[in-house]
Amino acid sequence: MVHVSSFKNDHPLDKRREVAERIRSKYLDRIPVIVEKAPRSDAPDIDKKKYLVPADITVGKFVYEIRKHMTKVSAEKAIYLFVNNTIPPTAALISQIYERYKDEDGFLYITYSGENTFGSDL
């Protein structure tokens, strides 16, 4: 079953496209990204969904930035990003991921999930 973005449900295509085009024309070196938690994920929530990401940062650096916006994330919790149901390479540039996976509205949609990496609490 494919997860449909709540951002897409809340905003019509033409409005999303207009916003993305305005962002891309005003900030040439930035990528408009929507980040949402995967369904049934126990990862912490984030305080915002829309990000204006520098085109030249890596996926790994973006994970670090996402962690800073999470509420109560423990060091043991690994955060995974998914683009089009695939985990992108950590060293890939956001601009590369955008060019390959951007949506028809001009946004890059990223889903995140988490997992405890050092075992569970007993």
From Swiss-Prot:
Record flagged with keyword Phosphoprotein: no
Chain coiled-coil ranges: none
UniProt subcellular location: Cytoplasmic vesicle, Autophagosome membrane
A Gene Ontology biological process term: sorocarp development
Entry superkingdom: Eukaryota
Record key words, sorted: Autophagy, Cytoplasmic vesicle, Lipoprotein, Membrane, Protein transport, Transport, Ubl conjugation pathway
Post-translational modification: The C-terminal 3 residues of atg8 are removed by atg4 to expose Gly-119 at the C-terminus. This Gly-119 forms then a thioester bond with the 'Cys-563' of atg7 (E1-like activating enzyme) before being transferred to the 'Cys-288' of atg3 (the specific E2 conjugating enzyme), in order to be finally amidated with phosphatidylethanolamine. This lipid modification anchors atg8 to membranes and can be reversed by atg4, releasing soluble atg8.
Membrane topology: Lipid-anchor
Annotated lipid attachment (Phosphatidylethanolamine amidated glycine): 119
Name this polypeptide is given: Autophagy-related protein 8
Organism from which the protein derives: Dictyostelium discoideum
Gene: atg8
